[in-house]
Each structure stands twice: as C-alpha cells, then as structure tokens.
Amino acid sequence: MDAIKKKMQAMKLEKDNAMDKADTCEQQARDANLRAEKVNEEVRELQKKLAQVEEDLILNKNKLEQANKDLEEKEKQLTATEAEVAALNRKVQQIEEDLEKSEERSGTAQQKLLEAQQSADENNRMCKVLENRAQQDEERMDQLTNQLKEARLLAEDADGKSDEVSRKLAFVEDELEVAEDRVKSGDAKISELEEELKVVGNSLKSLEVSEEKANQRVEEFKKQLKTLTGKLKEAEARAEYAEKTVKKLQKEVDRLEDELGINKDRYKSLADEMDSTFAELAGY
C-alpha cells in the first residue's frame, strides 16, 4: 500500500511537473508567436521601406539620366553659343577693319577733293587774269587800229610825210600783229584752261560721288557694327546664361548622384536587415 501511495505521489509529482513544463512550453510558444508576429510586422515594414527605397532609387536614376541629358544639351548649346560669339567677334573685327579702310579712303578722297578745289580755284584765277589780259590786248588792238586809221588819214593828207607815216604804220602793224598773236595765245590758253577746268570739274564731281559713296559705306559699316555689337552682347548674355545653367545642372547632377548613393546605402542596409530578420525567423 505504501508502495502504491509512493508511486501515486511520484506520478502526481510527475504530472505536476509535466503540467508545469506544458505551461512553460505554452508560454514559450506564445512568446515565440508574439516574437514571430513582431518580426513579421518588422519584415512587412522593412518590405514597405525597401519598396519605397526602390521607387526612390528608380526615380532618382530617372532624374539623374534626365539631368545628364539636360546637361549635355546645355553644354552643346553653350558650345554653339561660344562658336557664335567667336564668329561674331571675327565679323566685328572684319567690319572694324573695313570701316577703318573706308575712313582712310574717305580721308584720301577728301584730300584729293580739296586739292582739286584748290586747283580749280587757281585755274579760275588764271582764267580771270588771262581774260583781263585779253581784254587789255583787245583794248590795245582797238587803240592801235585807231592809230592805224589816223596814220592812213595822215598818209592821205600828207604825202610829204609818207616815209615817217610808213614807219609809223609799219610799227603800228607790227604792234597790232604782236597784239593779235597775244590775243590768239590768250584765247588758246583760255580754251586750254577751260578744258582743264572742265576736267577738274568732272574730277570734282567724281570725287564728290566717291566721297558720298564712301560716307554711305562708312554709315553702312557703322550700322552693321552696331547691329553686330548688339548681337554679340546678346550671344554673350546667352553664353553666360547657358554657363550658369550648366553649373546649376551640374550641381543638380552632383546632388542626385549623392542622393542616389545614399539611397543605395539605405537599400543595402535594409536588404541586410531583412536578411538578418529572415535568418532570425528561420531560427525559430
């Protein structure tokens, strides 16, 4: 009987121990389930974060690609604008050289015009002198003609004085011939000077036309220079703006690359954390 009691007590004790162990196992199971649920919740949260990071990663990659495209386009525009500025600078330099040459030609034409005007004034003065001399010669001829008439009258009235009258007549005729020669020479000189004056007049007209054309050319060059200077300023402004845009885009590219690197690190960290969580779940 005692043996049975002892055995019953032992069985009861074993039962109590089994119950305690069962309770402990149930509690451990509940704790494990709670930890599993918590880990699963953390996994779901990590998956959400990972998905968000992947979306951010893709978005940043797209932004980076677009920023690089914009940067390349702006660099092309900057190169084209710089080439345009260089071409405009060369054209402005050529226009300035042409303008300088035109101004030199205009100055030369003005100098020639001044010299031609002075020559024309000198010829006019000579013409007036010759005209005055011719007029004096004509007056002298008239005087000699009158003297000749008087001499002839004297010859008719005084035959006794024929020798003296003949000498006087011969002298008067010689003087008359000399005067006529001088008149002819003066007329020829006047004609020559008038012809030269006509040539000078034509030269003056030609020089005036050349000067006018040169002045027009200078004005055209000045207008072209003003227009090109305006275009050059616009091109330089565009180049400056393009350069600022390129710098701005370069900063944006650098920022996106940094952000992309940060997201990659976050992605790697989350992936490592998820691997650790899955390993922890596998341990349960």
From Swiss-Prot:
The keyword Transit peptide does not apply. Residues 12-26 have a biased composition (Basic and acidic residues). Residues 1-26, 96-124 are annotated as: Disordered. It comes from the Eukaryota. PROSITE patterns: TROPOMYOSIN (PS00326). Residues 1-276 form a coiled coil. Keywords: Coiled coil, Repeat. The keyword Repeat applies. Residues 107-121 have a biased composition (Polar residues). Belongs to the tropomyosin family. Homodimer. Tropomyosin, in association with the troponin complex, plays a central role in the calcium dependent regulation of muscle contraction. This is Tropomyosin-1. It comes from Bombyx mori. The lineage of its organism: Eukaryota, Metazoa, Ecdysozoa, Arthropoda, Hexapoda.
